[in-house]
Each structure stands twice: as structure tokens, then as C-alpha cells.
Amino acid sequence: MTKLSKRVQALRTKVDRNRTYPVTEALALVKECATAKFDESIDIAVNLGIDARKSDQLVRGSVVLPAGTGKSVRVAVFAQGDKAEAARAAGADVVGFEDLAEQVKAGNIDFDLCIATPDAMRVVGQLGQILGPRGLMPNPKVGTVTMDVTTAVKNAKAGQVQYRTDKGGIIHATIGRASFSTEALQQNLGALVDALVKAKPAASKGIYLRRVALSSTMGSGVRVEPSSINAA
């Protein structure tokens, strides 16, 4: 245990907390510091130049990461008729309507993401107190309330991540695993940042991407030079 601690400490000394790294170097450092016995997630925190107290500056949406997330996602779909069949054909793990709502009320929540057709929201809306705290409530802003359930399910399975600013105006997301290549992580990071830039509120003034930091589950944070992300 002592040897492991010394090794981790040695790796962490490689990270200069006062330096902002080019994205390729930052990703290499984060991967090098991911020494846990499990495949650590690679996480990003983006501090945006918004006023998080104002509703018109809330940044929320979703993006499909080109290299995936490295995680298997169980998808539930609230739909009926042809849309239910389309959801099953697209690979949804759980499909139902009022019967699925009863399962949720009974505490049987065996899924990681929830999609609903607009007409199903009269049923799903009654589950707000159950799904909301778990981050599972469908929302049109992230593409989980839609008539196009086929695309929604396929995107979820392909590696779609949702993002939303917290009270401090920071976006937290996972862009992959330590086992991913630097190139794959860079592709995912670029896709997420592109999505954030496109979602910039009109009322946001000044520098938008104020600070970007990467870390693994158990590793140190590494600051990234924002201008290097899409230029690399």
C-alpha cells in the first residue's frame, strides 16, 4: 500500500497546478495519473462565462461523443403503438407506457436514461418526484422528449452525454475512460466543447470558456488551455 501511495504521489508531482497545458499534453498527463485498478473515467469541468443566477443564461443540452463513453447505458422509453415498436427496434432496454409508470412507482428503476414521446409526458409527469432527483426526467432540451424515438435511443446507445451548468456556472461531464487513446479522448473533448460553444447564451458577455480542467476518477486535476482544444 505504501509503495502504491508513493507511486501515486510521484505521478501527481508531475502536474504543475499553476500551469495551463495544451490539450494533448493535458490528456497524456491525466491518463498517466490514472493508476487505479479499475478503468477510471476521464472527467471535464468547464467554467463558463455566464451569470448562473439568470435563467436565460442556463446552458443545457446533449451531444453524442464520437468515440463513445465506454459505458453501457440501459435506456427506457415511454411510448405506445408504433413509437413503442420503433423504440424496441432501435435497441431500447425497457419500453412501456402506464405499465412502465407503475413499475417506476414501485421502485423498479432498472435504467440509466429515460426517453418519452410528447403524448407520454402526461404519464411521465406524475413521476417527477421519483425521476427528477435521479436525473432521469425526460426533457426536450436534451432530446429525451421526442417523436423520433429511434434517433434518441440510438444516440443514447452510441455515447450521448447530457450537460447542464450548475449553480456556479460550471459544466461537469465524462468524456471517456483511461483506457481510451489520447486521440479518442481528444475527439470527445472537442465534440463537447463545440456543443457548449454553439449553446452559448446571447446574453453571455466577455470570455465564454473561462477555465477547463481534466481529471481521472482518482487523479489530480489538470488545467487545459481552451484555445488548444479544437486547434489540436
Swiss-Prot record:
Any Pfam family: Ribosomal_L1
UniProt cross-references to Gene3D superfamilies, sorted A to Z: 3.30.190.20, 3.40.50.790
GO biological process, one term: translation
Family: Belongs to the universal ribosomal protein uL1 family.
CDD domains: Ribosomal_L1
Name recorded for this polypeptide: Large ribosomal subunit protein uL1
Keyword RNA-binding attached: yes
GO CC term, one of those recorded: cytosolic large ribosomal subunit
Highest rank taxon of the organism: Bacteria
Job description of the protein: Binds directly to 23S rRNA. The L1 stalk is quite mobile in the ribosome, and is involved in E site tRNA release.
Keyword set, alphabetical order: Repressor, Ribonucleoprotein, Ribosomal protein, RNA-binding, rRNA-binding, Translation regulation, tRNA-binding
Assembly with partners or alone: Part of the 50S ribosomal subunit.
HAMAP family: Ribosomal_uL1_B
PANTHER family tied to this protein: 54S RIBOSOMAL PROTEIN L1, MITOCHONDRIAL, LARGE RIBOSOMAL SUBUNIT PROTEIN UL1M
Alphabetized GO MF terms: rRNA binding; structural constituent of ribosome; tRNA binding
